[in-house]
Amino acid sequence: DIYAVVSDKSDSALYFNFRIQVNPKTGELEQIENLGFTERTDGTLNDGKPWQGKEKGFDHEAIVKVSDSSLVIASEGYCRLKEFPILPTSADAAKVGYQQNLWESRWASSDFYPNYNFESLAFDSIRQYLWTIPESTLRKDGQPATPQNGLANQLRLMRLDWGKIKENRNKEDNGKEDSSEQVSSKKDSRYMTTYAYQMDQPSTHKKADIYVMGVSELCALPDGQLLVLEREAFIPKIKIGAFCKCKFYQINPLNSEGFSMKENFSSDTPFLKKRLLTEWKTGLSLSKRSFANYEGITIHDILQNFWLSILMIISTLRGKSVTIRDRQFMQSRVQ
């Protein structure tokens, strides 16, 4: 019942540990407790002493556990996906020999529009696949969706074969290949398969003070399919009338045609077929204050009534508050 949660504002805590207890019958949240953090952003243990790292502006947006000893975190500020060791929970814990040759994938910031790069991660532990997708359209693929242009974001869903990546890293550790960071990064494309994903168009044409339209999270299902959270956040200058519209789609990329990173989008592009599971809208009005910006998803468990319980996390665009809520889907609806 311990979950790792990243913060897009912290330059000291790598992630926070939350104890989340859910009713096994109803799926309702019963208790949420922030246990603090054990690991710093530089990968060292938090010993409780004042500390300030040399690097700042990570803007960590997503986290997945990829093994018993490591996890991967997406940094929007650094345009990277990076593996970190899972450290002991206390300074008195026995020292363990951690893997040093950890994986990292960096992208050029020029590939993305501002604040529109890596927002999501999902890990399929059964097939050892690491999934991610840019939040919005890449620069080389066109303009991001806005209320004014009415475009549908065209994204590139990426599947990294984590099993093969780690197998290759183990060979490097044994001295069979060059283990330099630069060389290893160039080889990652050998283990990556990409797919074309098209979002829905903006639902409004009104002028916004803040507007965000993109995929805010992915979630890997046990059968190899994915849940995709499309999120549209609209905030006018006067704030009244702000809304956040979310749509949950189910896709099956493993049974779909791939789309190379070198290919250009066209009328013949094999976009992934998507099935709408549910959608909801929250907002801000004179009488109602329900605005909720959903940014994280994880599978909790199968409930006693055979429903699939999914935990979701929300945060404000200004970073002033973070809460956790839950939504449920019948297992038969996501198979």
PLM regions and their residue ranges:
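Sequence/structural signature of beta-propeller domains
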Residues: 1-335
